[in-house]
């Protein structure tokens, strides 16, 4: 009944527009105005006809579209978020690996530099600890006037011969050096041996096999010659000395000549006296 009344109310105003101008046909309009929705719909009839179904369709379809789109949006955001997190984690891993590699390289370089420094320090210690026998000896720039240059001394601690530059004299005598320098030396040891020593020994060795008489004659001749040479008052020429030396050598070498000289008559006064005149020497 309500729908029929609505249809009748919609048809009547369009067909009975002149009746509205006349007064008697206005009862139907009043009846239609009694319904609360008809008047509002009649005033907004074009809006109701055009927008009401679309509004209803939108109201009915909008929750469905919203319901379909709502579950899709969190999934897309979640997947993108996961992808972003994975990318960040991958970048973090790459950065961590690069940082770790750099740390390892720096640690290796530091260890290598430490090893080189330790090796250099060990070499320095070995060089300084190597035994040096003469480095610790203080060498004076001015040589000592009492000690000889280049003199060697035996060191009992080093078991070797070292130079005596700045070292005290060793208590053990050196087997290589025969003579040692002394400050106070006796003048007797400095006297040179006699030149007639070898000749005297030779004559003594040869006279061991000769008779006693021959030995006495030779000694008398030698003693007289030495006394004559040592006497500063007698001047003897070089010719006579050469003749005496030759006669003495011939007398020592040949026993016959010696016997002739010893058998010659000599006065006891001349034999006892240590001096022989120059004339007799020249005659001989």
UniProtKB/Swiss-Prot annotation:
Q: Where is the composition biased (Polar residues)?
A: 256-267
Post-translation changes = CHEK1-mediated phosphorylation at Ser-34 negatively regulates its ability to inhibit serine/threonine-protein phosphatase 2A (PP2A) activity. Phosphorylation leads to its release from the PP2A complex and its sequestration by 14-3-3 proteins in the cytoplasm resulting in its inability to translocate to the nucleus, where it otherwise inhibits PP2A.
Q: Does the keyword field hold Nucleus?
A: yes
Any single GO molecular-function term of the entry would be: protein serine/threonine phosphatase inhibitor activity
Sorted alphabetically, the Gene Ontology BP terms of this entry are:
mitotic G2/M transition checkpoint; positive regulation of cell growth; positive regulation of proteasomal ubiquitin-dependent protein catabolic process
Q: Where is the composition biased (Low complexity)?
A: 175-185, 243-254
- Location relative to the cell: Nucleus; Cytoplasm
Stored InterPro entries: PBIR1/2/3
Asked whether the UniProt record includes Disulfide bond among its keywords, one would answer: no
UniProt modified residues of type Phosphoserine: 32, 34, 42, 45, 59, 73, 140, 144, 184, 186, 264, 267, 273
- Region annotated Disordered sits at 1-65, 164-185, 233-284
Q: Where is the composition biased (Gly residues)?
A: 20-29
Q: Which positions are linked by Glycyl lysine isopeptide (Lys-Gly) (interchain with G-Cter in SUMO1)?
A: 86
What is the superkingdom listed in this entry's lineage?
Answer: Eukaryota
Q: Which family does it belong to?
A: Belongs to the FAM122 family.
Its biological purpose is as follows: Acts as an inhibitor of serine/threonine-protein phosphatase 2A (PP2A) activity. Inhibits PP2A activity by blocking the substrate binding site on PPP2R2A and the active site of PPP2CA. Potentiates ubiquitin-mediated proteasomal degradation of serine/threonine-protein phosphatase 2A catalytic subunit alpha (PPP2CA). Inhibits PP2A-mediated dephosphorylation of WEE1, promoting ubiquitin-mediated proteolysis of WEE1, thereby releasing G2/M checkpoint.
Q: Which PANTHER family match?
A: FAMILY WITH SEQUENCE SIMILARITY 122B ISOFORM X1 (PTHR22227), PPP2R1A-PPP2R2A-INTERACTING PHOSPHATASE REGULATOR 1 (PTHR22227:SF14)
Q: What is this protein called?
A: P2R1A-PPP2R2A-interacting phosphatase regulator 1
Source gene? Pabir1
């Amino acid at each position: 009944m309500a729908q029929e009344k609505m249809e009748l109310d919609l048809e009547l105003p369009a067909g009975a527009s002149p009746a509205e101008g006349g007064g008697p046909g206005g009862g139907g309009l009043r009846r239609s105005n009694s319904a609360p929705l008809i008047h509002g719909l009649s005033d907004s009839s074009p809006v109701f006809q055009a927008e009401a179904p679309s509004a209803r369709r939108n109201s009915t379809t909008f929750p469905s579209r919203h319901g379909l789109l709502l579950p899709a949006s969190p999934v897309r955001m979640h997947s993108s978020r996961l992808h972003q997190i994975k990318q960040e984690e991958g970048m973090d891993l790459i950065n961590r690996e690069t940082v770790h590699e750099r740390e390892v390289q720096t640690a290796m370089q530091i260890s290598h530099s430490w090893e080189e420094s330790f090796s250099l320090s060990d070499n320095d210690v070995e060089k300084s600890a190597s035994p040096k026998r003469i480095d610790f000896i203080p060498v004076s720039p001015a040589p000592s006037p009492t000690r000889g240059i280049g003199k060697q001394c035996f060191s009992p601690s080093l078991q070797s011969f070292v130079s005596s530059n700045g070292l005290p004299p060793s208590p053990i005598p050196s087997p290589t050096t025969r003579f040692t320098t002394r400050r106070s030396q006796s003048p007797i040891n400095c006297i040179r041996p006699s030149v007639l020593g070898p000749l005297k020994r030779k004559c003594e060795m040869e006279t061991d096999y000769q008779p006693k008489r021959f030995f006495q004659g030779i000694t008398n001749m030698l003693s007289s010659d030495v006394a004559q040479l040592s006497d500063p008052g007698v001047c003897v020429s070089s010719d006579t000395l050469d003749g005496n030396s030759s006669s003495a050598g011939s007398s020592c070498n040949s026993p016959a000549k010696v016997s002739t000289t010893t058998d010659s008559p000599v006065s006891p006064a001349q034999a006892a006296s240590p001096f022989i005149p120059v004339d007799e020497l020249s005659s001989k």
